[in-house]
Amino acid sequence: MDWSTLGVVIVPPIAGGIIGYFTNDLAISMLFKPYRAIKIGDRRLPFTPGLIPRNQERLAQKVSDAIMTSLLTPEELQAIAQRLLQTERVQGAIFWLLQLALDQVKSDTGQRTAQILANILRDFADQSLPRIIVALARREDFLQDQLDQVFDQVLLDLQLTDDQAQQLANWIINVVVPPDTLRLLLIDFLTDRNIAILDRDLRTKTSGTYWLVANVMGVQSSLVKLRTFCIEEKLACNAIVAELLTSLGIRQRFVEWLASLSLQNLPVRTVRQLRQQFRESVRGYTQNKGISVLQNLGTSVDWDETAMLIVKRLQTSEVVTTSLKDISEDLALILERYLERDLEMIVVKALPILNLDQVIIDRVNHTAPEDLEAAIQGIVKTELQAIVILGGVLGIVIGLLQSLILLFS
């Protein structure tokens, strides 16, 4: 076999294999190169820049449409959101946020948290709370159970101590009804008409010794003399009245009566009426003066100091730290129930906000043609290497066929 025949047999398979193996790289390079338009004067050379750089905007739109219609559909995004928002993941995220907030509160040295809390408490006490209380006071059952409990457990058991009863009895004897007041009351009572009525009743309605005294001696003159004595002899009359109060033990009787005074001794019907009146009084007072009273009470409280105490308590409270897990679990369950109902609607509303198609278009448009070519070449070399090898094999096969044709021709 001479060299010409050997060349006919060997060269076509080798050339076909080389061409087939490097065709993919050559084709990809032809799609991208040249990267920029080549101009001679003011005229652009044909086929410059390459096919993809020249139509990069349209390619970006096609890529975006393909991804949004085939890959990132609303159903797929909803499935992704469901996987991301599983209860365990949501609970972990909420727990992390709560722990982060607690750490921030513990490390807060600028009193910022306390100031924010103080403003919230001040606004709530001055504005929101009074309006809420007054609105609730318009209801018939406003604090009914609570007020009944206060009445039954506090007011119903309220009773004066011995010292309080002694002080109140002294006040009654010395201030309310002193001897001079009793003297004046006696003078006002012993009018001529009352004296005549007493004299007539004693004469007609008594018997025995009292009848004899009333009819023989009479009481009219004695009562008139008593009235005259009270009017003319003030000091002596007051002394006699004071002596009578002492000898009769009126002060001690007042003490015993006041010490035994209690709402429990009243009839059940009266107690029920007092309970109802107590509720209505509190309700009416709240409706009329509740806003002003609560606002004045709110202004009298040092909310800055109160907020600081609360924050310090939170910083050292073990209950807050141990309850974060339970709180995060409850919040995660609430969020899960909400997402089960409204996740599809949320995804539909979120898609226009995310504007994923425009993000893809912008990303493709802002990617340099060199980077696109390198990315595609990398995919071909790593993921599509079998196609490259297949191209070389096909080139060798075609070269062998060509060699056979040349030999037999």
Swiss-Prot record:
This is UPF0754 membrane protein AM1_5604. One of its GO terms (cellular component) is plasma membrane. Belongs to the UPF0754 family. Keywords: Cell inner membrane, Cell membrane, Membrane, Transmembrane, Transmembrane helix. The keyword Cell membrane applies. Signal peptide: none annotated. Its main location: membrane. The keyword Cell membrane applies. The chain crosses the membrane at residues 3-23, 387-407. It comes from Acaryochloris marina (strain MBIC 11017). It is found in: Cell inner membrane. It is a multi-pass membrane protein.
